[in-house]
Swiss-Prot record:
InterPro entries assigned: AcCoA_carboxyl_beta, Acetyl_CoA_COase_Trfase_b_su, ClpP/crotonase-like_dom_sf, COA_CT_N, Znf-ACC
Annotated binding of Zn(2+), by residue: 38, 41, 57, 60
Protein name: Acetyl-coenzyme A carboxylase carboxyl transferase subunit beta
Provenance organism: Clostridium botulinum (strain Kyoto / Type A2)
PANTHER family per record: ACETYL-COENZYME A CARBOXYLASE CARBOXYL TRANSFERASE SUBUNIT BETA, CHLOROPLASTIC
Pathway given in the UniProt record: Lipid metabolism; malonyl-CoA biosynthesis; malonyl-CoA from acetyl-CoA: step 1/1
Amino acid sequence: MLKNLFRKTKYITVSQKNIGNYKRENTPTIPDGMWVKCNKCGEILYQNDLEKNYMVCNLCGNHFRIGVKERIKYLFDKDTFKEWDYKIKTENPLDFKGYDEKIEHIKEKTNLSEAVTTGKGKIAGMEVVVCIMDSKFMMGSMGSVVGEKITRAIERAIELRLPVIIFTASGGARMQEGILSLMQMAKVSSALAKLDEEGLLYICVLTDPTTGGVTASFAMLGDIILAEPDALIGFAGKRVIEQTINEKLPEDFQKSEFLLEHGFIDKIVPRSDLRKVLAKLINMHQNSF
């Protein structure tokens, strides 16, 4: 009896080769990109439903970061957007090591020419000039080409007597271009001052994230400043500020809701309502003259 109790267990060994040859004929395959996990609530979302809902989680309302193509799709009347200045090429004025290669790699990966796309389109039949920043391109950092494209768009808006809408999404000035990137803050701000002198409307829509030199310049110069829900908006990072002033900062003090509460922005607009709100603001401005 004891001999049977402590006898060695026998196992069947299956080689890895045999496992690899085993085919699960009835196992369904799920194509890549069909399901997306919400990074806020953890819900697994069907990609097609998410796109129909403006890339917003239907459970918690989390606004996913979106790029230029999605913005154009959700904002403009169909087939009315015309891109400007897409041939302007990014240079390496400081001969920063690896910068040229990095730019080319990101261009191939994102199919974008730079961190901002500018152009003209129609919202509810009304023409507007728009600049859309995309955080997928070097975190939407502002270099000389970004500043040049936005400035040209504003100058063209003055010529055409059209309102300007800028969607911000940026980590700030591009370090690889040094002082030239910081110059773009003043350059764009100067162009916006001329737009203001002409009595033309400038609406800024702050999206997640809007930080650094972009926040310190044109992001906060709008006649009307809108923001998407729960967007990160600030200049320096929270930890940097806390270490500098040696004080604990309020929770979510760099979120759009906090900024609205303290009078830094005019309104928080869910993405699904943005086109309607912008159309109303543009129409009101046009009818005031």
